[in-house]
Amino acid sequence: MESIDSDIMDTVLSYTSEFDQLRYSERNVTDALNKERLDIQDLGSLLSPAAEPFLEEMAVRAKKETSRFFGNSVCLFTPIYVSNYCENRCTYCGFNKDNNIHRARLSAEDVEKDMGTIAASGLTEILILTGESRKMSGVQYIGDCVRTAKGYFRSIGLEVYPLNTDEYQYLRDCGADYVTVFQETYDPDLYSKFHLEGPKTVFRYRFDAQERALRGGMRGVAFGALLGLGDPMKDAFACALHGYLVQRKYPHAEISFSLPRLRPFVNGGTGTSGVSEKQLLQIALAYRIFMPFAGETISSRESPKFRDNIVGMCATRISAGVSVGIGRNEKKGDEQFEISDTRDVEEIRKALQKKGMQPVFNDYVRV
């Protein structure tokens, strides 16, 4: 595991340890909403209980910022899970190596066939996902999937296990554009309780993944905390700060945030407290106001109604026609979690147009 020279993790953990949600007042919230550019303390105020009565005002400001930087466009993409083998024992995940599920890895022929099916829906952006197993989904295998995807899609993202800089560079050379890594929780103590075995137990290596990806030449990186593992507002604060500091250090990078909540999975649950839609909305609005130019993805974990309401207000990216199992044309392996929005691409497109939004199938040209 590569170690890089970076102080971002120490800075994020220091600020997060001092984040006291109860110290903020309604005056702090209104002051933040009246600022052109927000600082870290303003972010904290928008994630505090004091901001709860101001969700409508936050929504107005968020929508203004979204319109300013993104217009009425919403980017569509879909994930493809190519393998669900995993070497980690994470208590909240269906891919947990000890979970008794049907494991599978797509062959080159399967990948080609499934990508062709996805491309036929009109989508030109794809996100390739694997379980975290270097043995069963090695860097070479991922690279082969990326090369195949390059024949069908104009933008290719990766949501795989953290890699070293040279491995990210290899995948960039294969045709990958951006990398998504969820830190899950930014509380190191809780992190160790949820991640019991495997390479994912190394908190720092995962934390530094976005920096290594950018050093490897990726044009964009995405951040996310799995809301519900820890204190959702504290994790959201840390996640936003993480993205903010990476943006300052790498000003050329395209930054985006994902907002995943815990979902049920095959053979298990987590026993952790849930995160309400109201809390999720507050976090999404705070992200948009704090980093108005960052992308924001709302996944199929959420209901169609919630997703339809949040796009245009603060979310700028939405998945469509989602399958979280292994195999599109023929199911070969079990899902990582349950989804809530099962609409296909055409249904999502029509829903966006009904709202006066512009569905965007491609916002990137490869040269």
Where are these regions (language model features)?
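Short, charged low-complexity linear segments at domain edges
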Residues: 54-75
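Generic structural signal for well-ordered alpha-helices
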Residues: 78, 115, 142-146, 168, ...
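Canonical Radical SAM [4Fe-4S] cluster-binding loop centered on the CxxxCxxC motif
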Residues: 68-110
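Catalytic cores of alpha/beta
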Residues: 164-173, 230-244, 303-313
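Conserved, mostly hydrophobic/aromatic
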Residues: 35, 62, 90, 128, ...
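Core AdoMet radical
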Residues: 97-112, 118-213, 219-223, 229, ...
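Auxiliary Fe-S-binding modules of radical SAM enzymes
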Residues: 1-51, 248-367
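Glycine-rich, proline-tolerant flexible connector loops at the mouths of alpha/beta enzymes
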Residues: 47, 78-80, 127-139, 264, ...
